[in-house]
């Protein structure tokens, strides 16, 4: 299982310290590789094919050394996807604990997801598949599993409404959950399409007005 990155560890620009990297543990080296990869995906060349030569140069090690930390580039991207899942779903779990009202839960979770996308453009490119266009097809399937899991999370939250609040929805909970995930995917795609000039949390409250009637 890949080591987990926190959002804070993704944000700062990594420093190139090739002279010191050999003193770091394997876990720290893997962390650095993933952090540098994330920032390269964030950069202006983030849509270009990511090569191990380019990544090794930015990390400050040889390609051979890079493969000591990860057996393949595919494994690096798989680790990034696992870290996205860990970061988002841990925050979803926290939101569920802090908020008991279903309407507020869904609102807060959507807002949190869009905030994540805003802060992590490189990872958003992974979620839309743009960063994976030149990689193995199984990575696209792995991202699809992430969205399936997100949809199931929404289904569970919506189904709990009847037990917690004694209320139901005018349409099936799974249909609503599918719409919520599609809404997220659409915002991610627009963010990438506009090269992150349009932030998904801008105008969110106005867009929320189309979702809110489902909870009445």
From Swiss-Prot:
It is found in: Cytoplasm, Nucleoid. One of its GO terms (molecular function) is sequence-specific DNA binding. GO terms for cellular component: bacterial nucleoid; cytoplasm. Keywords: Cell cycle, Cell division, Cytoplasm, DNA-binding. PANTHER family: ACREF/ENVCD OPERON REPRESSOR-RELATED (PTHR43479), ACREF_ENVCD OPERON REPRESSOR-RELATED (PTHR43479:SF11). Required for nucleoid occlusion (NO) phenomenon, which prevents Z-ring formation and cell division over the nucleoid. Acts as a DNA-associated cell division inhibitor that binds simultaneously chromosomal DNA and FtsZ, and disrupts the assembly of FtsZ polymers. SlmA-DNA-binding sequences (SBS) are dispersed on non-Ter regions of the chromosome, preventing FtsZ polymerization at these regions. NCBIfam families: PRK09480.1. Homodimer. Interacts with FtsZ. This is Nucleoid occlusion factor SlmA. It comes from Mannheimia succiniciproducens (strain KCTC 0769BP / MBEL55E).
């Amino acid at each position: 299982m890949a080591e987990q990155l926190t959002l804070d560890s993704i944000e700062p620009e990594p420093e190139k310290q090739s002279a010191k990297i050999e003193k770091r543990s394997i876990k720290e080296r893997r962390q650095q590789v993933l952090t540098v990869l994330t920032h390269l995906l964030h950069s202006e060349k983030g849509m270009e094919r990511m090569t191990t030569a380019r990544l090794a140069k930015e990390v400050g090690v040889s390609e051979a050394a890079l493969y000591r930390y990860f057996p393949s580039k595919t494994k690096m991207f798989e680790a990034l996807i696992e870290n996205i899942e860990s970061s988002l779903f841990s925050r979803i779990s926290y939101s569920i604990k802090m908020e008991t009202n279903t309407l507020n839960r869904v609102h807060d979770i959507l807002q949190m997801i869009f905030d994540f996308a805003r802060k992590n453009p490189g990872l958003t490119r992974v979620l839309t598949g743009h960063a994976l266009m030149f990689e193995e097809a199984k990575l696209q399937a792995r991202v699809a599993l992430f969205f399936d899991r997100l949809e199931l999370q929404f289904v569970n939250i919506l189904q709990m409404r009847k037990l917690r609040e004694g209320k139901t929805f005018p349409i099936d909970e799974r249909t609503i959950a599918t719409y919520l995930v599609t809404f997220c995917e659409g915002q991610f795609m627009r963010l990438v399409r506009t090269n992150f000039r349009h932030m998904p949390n801008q105008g969110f409250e106005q867009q929320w007005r189309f979702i809110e009637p489902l909870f009445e």
